[in-house]
A protein has these predicted regions:
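Short, charged/polar N-terminal "headpieces" of proteins
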Residues: 1-29
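Acidic, low-complexity intrinsically disordered segments
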Residues: 2-6, 31-66
Length: 66
């Protein structure tokens, strides 16, 4: 089983990229077999990009009102 530990969304030129950190857990023992594994990829799914745009607008609204 893969246990998501965290992720970050970043601008990379005109694209959005997601960086993910996770642990691999043995299904039978429940013990970790690999810690802090990382992967990243460009986000191309339109619905995911729209969700990110909404979160970006929310975050911008917070700092605009500080």
């Amino acid at each position: 089983m893969n246990n998501l530990k965290g992720y970050a969304i970043a601008n990379d030129g005109n694209m959005k990229r997601i960086a993910i950190t996770y642990d691999v857990i043995d299904d039978e023992t429940g013990k970790p077999t690999a810690l802090n594994k990382k992967t990243n990829m460009f986000i191309t799914d339109a619905s995911v990009l729209e969700t990110i745009r909404q979160i970006d607008a929310f975050a911008q609204g917070i700092i605009d009102n500080q």
